[in-house]
Curated annotation (Swiss-Prot):
It comes from Xenopus tropicalis (Western clawed frog). It is found in: Cell membrane. CDD domains: CYCLIN_CCNY_like. The gene is ccnyl1. GO terms for biological process: nervous system development. This is Cyclin-Y-like protein 1. Key regulator of Wnt signaling implicated in various biological processes, such as embryonic neurogenesis.
């Protein structure tokens, strides 16, 4: 009845499985600063906000972890975009924006790609273009042995000695990724998560994606994203059947190294996912990879409304499941009593 607030926690209670996985991290054990109390012999559970971070962590946040940070691929592409605009201005070349369709009061042009259901073909094009800019505008050629295609070839064909000197073009990267996504029947959301894991690997491991390692890095990111995102994940042996010449042992070893370099951080917040989606759309606009626009018809409007209602109902169900109902002491007078039946 006073102003004292108490909280009862069973000393035998164990954290939830999902929370335990979220705070598990490979590396040196975290030394939590705990003030031991004689009256509280229960175990201390580390909260995710209690983690220790580097001194410059908040100065340069990782874009794959924080929605406020700008994506790496978009910043690397700005140099080429500015050069293209400058060249078009000097040569009096139209950038192609005159053919773009704009909405009016009577007609609305929309594409079939949304943040919840992106277009597969357009998304793969944008993701591979982002990988292309990563390779082209890399700072150096830092790499690791596990990703070196010369030491771990994906095919039986001998890798040329000057393989690391020739940057792959966008079409080459697109064909490689499209083959994997088509054979494994992966979704467009998986492609976006693949790019998140790729940039997280480059940041955490402090390496660069270059001609000698890009295929194995992309393959490892796709492998991990397909297992995390899709309900029916593709097995490692399935990728071996797609690529033919790679062994299961090599796939397992690469996956293990990939997870260790990510410090087992495979979480992708919704805000980070949305940021990557819209930055990919910006990348497409800057490089004239426009999405297919069609006039909004009555049928398409009803379809979009149905998709919106489906997502809204889904989020409502999740919020209701997570909601905890409680009754305060102020409403004790208004509690309804069950009606008694007198026979």
């Amino acid at each position: 009845m006073g102003n004292t607030v108490t909280c009862c926690v069973s000393p035998d209670a164990s954290p939830k499985a999902g929370r335990d996985r979220a705070v598990t991290e490979r590396g040196e054990p975290y030394q939590a600063q705990v003030e031991l109390q004689e009256t509280d012999p229960g175990p201390h559970l580390q909260h995710i906000s209690d983690r220790e971070f580097p001194v410059d962590f908040h100065d340069e946040p990782n874009p794959s972890d924080h929605p406020q940070a700008s994506t790496i691929f978009l910043s690397k592409s700005q140099t080429d975009v500015r050069e293209k605009r400058k060249s078009n201005h000097i040569n009096h070349v139209s950038p192609g924006q005159l053919t773009k369709k704009y909405s009016s009061c009577s007609t609305i042009f929309l594409d079939d790609s949304t943040v919840s259901q992106p277009n597969l073909r357009s998304t793969i094009k944008c993701v591979t273009l982002a990988i292309y800019y990563h390779i082209k505008n890399r700072d150096s050629d830092r790499s690791l042995e596990i990703f070196d295609e010369k030491l771990h070839p994906l095919t039986r064909e001998e890798v040329a000695d000057d393989y690391c000197k020739h940057d792959p073009d966008h079409k080459h990267i697109y064909r490689f990724v499209r083959t994997l996504f088509s054979a494994a029947q992966l979704t467009a959301e998986c492609a976006i998560v693949t790019l998140v894991y790729l940039e997280r690997l480059l940041t955490y491991a402090e390496i660069d994606i270059c001609p000698s390692n890009w295929k194995r890095i992309v393959l490892g990111a796709i492998l991990l994203a397909s297992k995390v995102w899709d309900d029916q994940a593709v097995w490692n042996v399935d990728y071996c059947q797609i690529l033919k010449d790679i062994t299961v042992e090599d796939m397992n070893e690469m996956e293990r190294h990939f997870l260790e370099l990510l410090q087992f951080n495979i979480n992708v917040p919704a805000s980070v996912y949305a940021k990557y989606y819209f930055d990919l759309r910006s990348l497409a606009d800057d490089n004239n990879l426009s999405f297919l626009l069609e006039p909004l018809s009555k049928e398409r409007a009803q379809k979009l409304e149905a998709i919106s209602r489906l997502c809204e109902d889904k989020y409502k169900d999740l919020s209701k499941a997570a909601m905890r109902r409680s009754i305060s002491a102020d409403n004790l007078v208004g509690i309804r009593r069950s009606n008694a039946i007198i026979s």
